[in-house]
Swiss-Prot record:
EC number: 5.4.99.62
Compartments, as annotated in UniProt: Cytoplasm
Pfam families associated with the record: RbsD_FucU
Domain of life: Bacteria
Binding-site residues for substrate, renumbered to this chain: 28, 98, 120-122
Keyword terms, alphabetized: Carbohydrate metabolism, Cytoplasm, Isomerase
Description of how the protein assembles with itself and partners: Homodecamer.
Name assigned to this protein: D-ribose pyranase
Classification via InterPro entries: D-ribose_pyranase, RbsD-like_sf, RbsD_FucU
Source lineage: Bacteria, Bacillati, Bacillota, Bacilli, Bacillales
HAMAP family cross-referenced by the UniProt entry: D_rib_pyranase (MF_01661)
Annotated organism of origin: Bacillus cereus (strain G9842)
Amino acid sequence: MKKHGVLNSEIAAVLASLGHTDTVVIADCGLPIPDGVKRIDLAVEIGKPSFLEVLQVVADDMAIEKVTLAEEVIINNAEVNKEIEQKLIEPAFEYVSHEQFKEHTKKAKAIIRTGEATPYANVILHAGVIF
């Protein structure tokens, strides 16, 4: 049995398979998930698990080079935006329109769906390298 890092076998497998610049999305419960993209659904009820809880666990286990967010989060969910900026201080940040964000999700290796039910609580994590 694994005792450190991500315990969810689907998430652990996705993270282990990532190459440089591959992407993983952590999403609220309302983000549309495109056909053909792996869905890892963690939502058990509204708010559980939270977006920030899942982000923290994944970020602790992943080399992240860049973060993409919908620009709408800045005004419509400033608290989540602030928390993301505080948790992920090393990667570069990119803000795009929500429509562009949804287009980018079509290229993700996986989308991890949380129980989060606040606006624009979604992030695209771009894999970096560990060397």
